[in-house]
UniProtKB/Swiss-Prot annotation:
Coiled coil: none annotated. Residues 2-246 form the KaiC domain. Pfam families: ATPase. It comes from the Archaea. PANTHER family: UPF0273 PROTEIN TM_0370. It comes from Saccharolobus solfataricus (strain ATCC 35092 / DSM 1617 / JCM 11322 / P2) (Sulfolobus solfataricus). One of its GO terms (molecular function) is ATP binding. CDD domains: KaiC_arch. The keyword Nucleotide-binding applies. HAMAP family: UPF0273. PROSITE patterns: KAIC (PS51146). This is UPF0273 protein SSO1861. The lineage of its organism: Archaea, Thermoproteota, Thermoprotei, Sulfolobales, Sulfolobaceae. Belongs to the UPF0273 family.
Amino acid sequence: MKRVKTYIPGLDEILYGGIPERHIVLVSGGPGTGKSILGKQFLYNGLTKGEGGVFIALEEHPVSVRRSFEHFKWDVRKYEREGKFAIIDTFTGGIGNVAQREKYVVKSIDDVKELSENIRAAIKDINATRIVVDSVSTLYLTKPAMARSIVMQLKRVISGLGCTAIFVSQVSVGERGFGGPGVEHAVDGIIRLDLDEVEGVMYRSIIIWKMRDTKISMVRHPMDITDNGIIVQWDKYLKISNWSVSIQPLPENEISQMKKAVEEAEKEVEVKVEGKEEEE
């Protein structure tokens, strides 16, 4: 099976090599859990490896999107100038001088046809393989009755063009859902991020809730947000109760299996790169 490595430290290990190619993965969590960071890190890491990326901004101004990348010193403007990165602006509706300079603008988020056409154009223009939609929760606020069908339409377009995508989804503080009725059934995978308070201390964690066609880690892992982005402590698991927190090492056999899976995925990437170079 072909996989897309996230290159996020520790994440490919708990995914046993990476995300299966063409999968649509929901990254869900409450405020401050790192959902958008994970999506942007996935996109930027691909850019550094020569993979084109498209960011679909549903609830953030394009200027803010670029600024948020820069916070981690991820220079997406460089790749934008090189024609390897694009932003699809559905936030401004094309209103304002700054918005008018954007190449891909969707004037109404309700216009699924216009959105799909912009996605197709951007993917083809930059030969994109990685897509991030932030966030699909906006669809449930603006078009709750049509939200699931819109998500399915986006999935058909993105996957049909050979891309692998992350859909960011918001949930309320303390909520253990995934951010919208039925969305969890429309996607191929779910990654859940959490931020829990225990005795006045905050703990970050990540768990792979589901991922079709691949083995996954079945425990909750500690994670950190650093100046360089997200780091997953893939060789440890987190146990949280109302009064205590325990971080334990994974069994050695699981660690070995994860390492082996990542090594095999890396070999697949090397073969893919070599084949691409020969074609050129």
